[in-house]
Amino acid sequence: LKILVTGGNGEFCKHLVELGKEHSFLTPIKQPMYPGLDVRDYWNIDWYFKQKQYEFDYVIHAGAITRPMVIHEDNPTLSIKTNIVGTANVVMACEKYNKKIIYISTDYVYEGIDGDYKETDAMKPFTKYGWSKLGGECAVQMFDNHLILRMAMNRKPFPHPKALKDMRKSIMYIEDAAKVTLKLLNEKGIINVGGKSQSVYDFVKEENPDIQPIYLKDISDVNMATDCSMNTTKMKKVIDDTVI
């Protein structure tokens, strides 16, 4: 397959390219003589799609502002321009040039209380980051040829000395999330992508026995949730256990 990936500087994109040797990737990044692909600028995107339209058929839209989470609270305008308007710009270009969009979303679009969320469950983000990604999902769903992957992924090794003991998620490492994405490219609709439900602390402790616990009450700069775990039955029907 011929695939354009936004967010080319990110670890997720790098794993996609490394793991997807059988595919052809375009990863436009900023260079001295090239400004890169700015999703906030529709005409920049349109120009790139027009120049490269015969070099790709799929767009994995992973370009977004994610961390630190507090940036979405402190600067919602930047979050809107990048994660909502930027996604809408990519969608419009995909519609114009007849490309399939695979949108990398998040488990933070769910309410984060009851856990085991299915793709059909109601969405009620508990952070402005979650709202920004849900806004992107709305734009993506306006275009029929789409796939939305709601993910819970983290770097390996875990980049912090402490991990939440009282927050459950369905986390997987970024490399594993990239493996799953490559197996799902021809699917459509919405699919939850993640590992088993467990606390962030327990997930990290499997690789780092020295990790220290931290609790939700210790975090004050951004809203957090107790249980963002997802039901991944739909994902498991498509991939086999050897993928992750």
Regions picked out by a protein language model, each given a short descriptive name:
Residues 151, 156-186:
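Substrate-positioning beta->alpha
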Residues 65-77, 106-126:
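Active-site "gating" loop of Rossmann-like NAD(P)-dependent oxidoreductase/epimerase domains
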Residues 124-152:
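Active-site Tyr-X1-5-Lys
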Residues 24-48:
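Adenosine-cofactor binding site in Rossmann-like domains, unifying the SAM/SAH pocket
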Residues 42-82:
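NAD(P)H-binding glycine-rich loop region in Rossmannoid oxidoreductase-like domains
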